Curated annotation (Swiss-Prot):
Subunit organization: Monomer.
NCBIfam families: infC
Gene3D superfamilies named among the record's database cross-references: Translation initiation factor 3 (IF-3), C-terminal domain, Translation initiation factor 3 (IF-3), N-terminal domain
SUPFAM superfamilies attached to this UniProt entry: Translation initiation factor IF3, C-terminal domain (SSF55200), Translation initiation factor IF3, N-terminal domain (SSF54364)
Record-linked InterPro entries: T_IF-3_C_sf, T_IF-3_N_sf, Translation_initiation_fac3_CS, Translation_initiation_fac_3, Translation_initiation_fac_3_C, Translation_initiation_fac_3_N
Keywords from the named record: Cytoplasm, Initiation factor, Protein biosynthesis
Gene that this sequence comes from: infC
Name of the protein described by the UniProt record: Translation initiation factor IF-3
Annotated organism of origin: Shigella flexneri
Subcellular location: Cytoplasm
Pfam families: IF3_C, IF3_N
Function: IF-3 binds to the 30S ribosomal subunit and shifts the equilibrium between 70S ribosomes and their 50S and 30S subunits in favor of the free subunits, thus enhancing the availability of 30S subunits on which protein synthesis initiation begins.
One Gene Ontology term of the molecular function aspect: ribosome binding
Length: 206
């Protein structure tokens, strides 16, 4: 490589020749504490284990360990810095590829758990025909399966106000059709303004 410089990467941790310390606090494969050792010793332990050494805390001057690093590279292992601000820096012998995979997987799991529940609305009328009803029902099923709440708004117009019972029957039908997927969070006891509103929440998975 031109000038003998190491290409900078977007890795979150320093590994091998990127580690800037003469001594490191070393952690083994099972998390066991191996004490404070020279970087050369740490790399040799990583090589013996056939894994990577990850630096966890880098805060020292750079050092030349060409021989040890070449040996580690030949064995296909790394020394990975985990805690760059500790004194001395904390490094770990590990399979760095697996470490990054598990970290990414954990981050994705956290994002799933942090899903923001939305309330999605579908509007009905007392005179909603069967075809339109089934289309709206499929949308409600999709909302609930995605983990969102469903707001069912039944609107009355003109003379429909004289047939509020029909509106209540529509809401009860929706509730019954979705009973396997949802629980009723709120159900109207009377009309408010010109509408009735029912809110369904997805059932918690067993």
């Amino acid at each position: 490589m031109k000038g003998g410089k190491r290409v900078q990467t977007a890795r979150p941790n320093r590994i091998n020749g990127e580690i800037r310390a003469q001594e490191v606090r070393l952690t083994g494969l099972e998390g066991e504490q191996l004490g404070i050792v020279s970087l050369r010793e740490a790399l040799e332990k990583a090589e013996e284990a056939g894994v990577d050494l990850v630096e966890i805390s880098p805060n020292a001057e750079p050092m030349s360990l060409r021989e040890a690093l070449e040996k580690a590279e030949e064995a296909g292992v790394d020394l990975v810095e985990i805690s760059p601000n500790a004194e001395p820096p904390v490094c770990r012998i590990m399979d760095y590829g697996k470490f990054l995979y598990e970290k990414s997987k954990s981050s994705k799991e956290q994002k799933k758990k942090q899903k923001v529940i939305q309330v999605k609305e579908i509007k009905f009328r007392p005179s909603t025909d069967e075809g339109d009803y089934q289309v709206k029902l499929r949308s409600l099923i999709r909302f609930l399966e995605e983990g969102d709440k469903a707001k069912i708004t039944l609107r009355f117009r003109g003379r429909e106000m004289a047939h509020q019972q029909i509106g209540m029957e529509v809401l009860n039908r929706v509730k019954d059709d979705l009973q396997e997927l949802a629980v009723v969070e709120s159900f109207p006891t009377k009309i408010e303004g010109r509408q009735m509103i029912m809110v369904l929440a997805p059932k918690k998975k067993q």
